[in-house]
């Protein structure tokens, strides 16, 4: 199964959008393999955003993601899951995100764009390893409705 890491950022948590956002992924047939509410510390934030270190916005990213609790989740599905998740999330700038996407429906500002999602299957695996220990993840499991979603 292909996996993507999701982070419901501080603005999503503070605005009470956790349930509304999570339900969208469940309704599309994706399976949650891990889910937790946590406070990201500076070291973890710097590790997660390491690819942006040295860029003008790096310190702002670290400061924001550590400012309040976040929800971190791993969703899994068939090949193409990361692409599906990215389409559901919408453009980085909520002003340019299509209606029907998470950012298009709930987002207000590019600096408060609600959610992070892995941008490739490789990133999904790398980011999952940053936020979850193997024992915190549920592997393959079947829901009663899976036969109605997947061929």
Swiss-Prot record:
Keywords: ATP-binding, Cytoplasm, Kinase, Magnesium, Metal-binding, Nucleotide metabolism, Nucleotide-binding, Phosphoprotein, Transferase. Pfam families: NDK. Homotetramer. This is Nucleoside diphosphate kinase. PROSITE patterns: NDPK, NDPK_LIKE. Transmembrane segments: none annotated. The gene is ndk. It catalyses: a 2'-deoxyribonucleoside 5'-diphosphate + ATP = a 2'-deoxyribonucleoside 5'-triphosphate + ADP; a ribonucleoside 5'-diphosphate + ATP = a ribonucleoside 5'-triphosphate + ADP. The active site is at 116 (pros-phosphohistidine intermediate).
């Amino acid at each position: 199964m292909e996996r993507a890491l999701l982070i419901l950022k501080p603005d999503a948590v503070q605005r009470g959008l956790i349930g509304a956002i999570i339900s969208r992924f469940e309704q599309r047939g994706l399976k949650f393999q891990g889910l937790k509410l946590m406070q990201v510390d500076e070291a973890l934030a710097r590790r997660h955003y390491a690819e942006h270190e040295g860029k003008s916005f790096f310190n702002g990213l670290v400061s924001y993601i550590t400012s309040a609790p976040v929800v971190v989740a791993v969703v899994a599905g068939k090949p193409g899951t990361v692409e599906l998740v990215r389409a559901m999330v919408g453009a980085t700038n909520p002003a340019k995100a299509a209606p029907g996407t998470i950012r298009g429906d709930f987002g207000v500002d590019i600096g408060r764009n609600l959610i992070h999602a892995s941008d490739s299957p490789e990133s999904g695996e790398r980011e999952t390893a940053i936020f979850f220990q193997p024992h915190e993840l549920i592997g393959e499991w079947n829901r009663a409705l899976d036969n109605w979603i997947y061929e």
